[in-house]
Swiss-Prot record:
Enzyme Commission (EC) number: 4.1.1.126
InterPro entries per the UniProt record, alphabetical: UbiD, UbiD-like_C, UbiD-like_N, UbiD_Rift_dom
Protein's recorded name: Anhydromevalonate phosphate decarboxylase
Species this protein is from: Methanothermobacter thermautotrophicus (strain ATCC 29096 / DSM 1053 / JCM 10044 / NBRC 100330 / Delta H) (Methanobacterium thermoautotrophicum)
GO biological process: isoprenoid biosynthetic process
Length: 423
């Protein structure tokens, strides 16, 4: 993380005033949604809070050494060309001891939150059968000085825990908090269960990513600001939530697995990374890695796809814009169907020509305004499975999905040519 802070060259908003981890800190973060914020003086902890490392596409592009419109292609490249880790070090430079969450400035963000939440913690675990390492970011609610309730959706970590519980065993884990944006982004990618997110991160780092070996668990993790070691307990569940999710609304309360922590390692002059729930950092980290998934699915249908964006107005989750070089009539509708299938949470998708910048909401609106004929170009799919994060979805989880083909007809393409782009 420190190398990225040196690289970014951005003057952080540094708050010297004493603030509380309960609501006050989060209130400051909400007031500065695009800034890199450092809270130096927390009432409850000697460790400063940093937030906003990944709250713009520009910062993410900088961490990936690419331009903003190349982010999707850069992620696809790393997912398809992972680089094995060759360097593992020790915990030099850390102070180690018994895990005690009361030492950390873990924020309580909103009034109805179930408790303080770790929001930038990456859980590292191994497949009990194969030993393959998995890294994934999860929200974790504090329920004791050494215990967390963790939200685990049915993906890779969920499968690992199932395997361990079938054996009657706990699942060993490490939690890393405070790493560089490229490594953090890699932990959110959708790769096969037998692949390693750290090898994706290593490709982002041109093969130069070094991990550190934990003391009490069989795990190697990035050299994060804070590293916790422990176990997800076999068969133990606690109530988790409420928690404010992507849509700025409360997620439901569930019975979720429990983590018991044993060891804690803190770097000298550590900073605690906090992601504001429903803020841009939360939305980009969760949504942006789905763009390559949509891109690859669309490319199988229409090879001339140019870019895919999950828009910020759609919480980087529910709305997508896709640009293509249209070859035949019907390409737009095929893209709509491919995109909806690739990302089941997607609710509305707009397909535009390659002259439209999908990163610019005004450009997308322009395409809809000038190239859409409602009775021909809008595809409506009622009764489709939607997102659990969509407050408008029905109790059974279904919703109505909409696709808008905002591409110009090929037969009269000249009529739609934009003068400002051609003369």
């Amino acid at each position: 993380m420190r190398n990225f802070l040196d690289k970014i060259g951005e003057e952080a908003l540094v708050v010297e005033d004493e603030v509380s981890t309960s609501f006050e800190a989060a209130s400051i973060l909400r007031e500065h949604p695009r800034d890199l914020v450092i809270l130096k003086n927390l009432k409850e902890s000697d460790i400063p809070v940093i937030s906003g490392l990944c709250n713009t596409r520009e910062k993410i592009a900088l961490s990936l050494n690419c331009r903003v419109h190349e982010i999707t292609h850069r992620i696809v490249e790393a997912m398809e060309n992972p680089t094995p880790i060759s360097s593992v070090g020790g915990l030099d430079g850390y102070r180690s001891g018994r895990a005690d969450l009361s030492e950390l400035p873990i924020l309580r963000h909103y009034r109805r939150d179930g408790g303080p939440y770790i929001t930038a913690g990456v859980i590292f675990a191994r497949d009990p059968d194969t030993g393959v390492r998995n890294a994934s970011i999860h929200r974790m609610m504090v329920i004791g000085d050494d215990r967390l309730a963790v939200r685990i959706v049915p993906r890779h970590l969920y499968t690992y825990l199932q395997k361990a519980e079938e054996r009657g065993e706990d699942l060993e884990i490490a939690i890393a908090i405070g790493m560089d944006p490229a490594t953090l982004l890699a932990t959110t990618t959708s790769i096969p269960i037998d692949a390693d997110e750290m090898e994706v991160a290593n490709t982002f780092h041109e093969g130069e990513l070094e991990l550190v070996r934990c003391e009490g668990v069989d795990m190697e993790v990035p050299p994060a600001e804070i590293i916790l070691e422990g176990r997800i307990l076999c068969g133990v569940r606690e109530r988790e939530g409420p928690f404010v999710d992507l849509t700025d609304t409360y997620d439901v309360v569930r019975d979720e697995p429990v983590i018991s922590l044993e060891r804690m390692h803190i770097r000298k002059d550590a900073m605690y990374h906090a992601i504001l729930p429903a803020g841009f950092e939360h939305r980009l980290l969760q949504g942006l890695p789905q763009e390559p998934r949509i891109y690859r699915a669309v490319k199988n249908t229409v090879p001339t796809v140019r870019n895919v964006v999950l828009t910020e107005g759609g919480c980087c989750w529910l709305h997508a814009a896709v640009s293509i070089k249209k070859q035949t009539e019907g390409d737009g509708k095929n893209v709509i169907m491919a995109a909806l299938a690739a990302h089941p949470s997607l609710k509305h998708v707009v397909v535009v020509d390659e002259d439209i910048d999908v990163l610019d909401p005004e450009e997308i609106e322009y395409a809809i305004a000038t190239r859409v004929k409602g009775d021909d170009d809008i595809l409506i799919v009622p009764g489709a499975r939607g997102s659990s994060l969509d407050p408008a979805a029905l109790p059974d989880g279904t919703t109505t999905k909409v696709g808008v083909d905002a591409t110009a007809p090929l037969a009269s393409a000249e009529k739609f040519q934009r003068v400002s782009r051609s003369e």
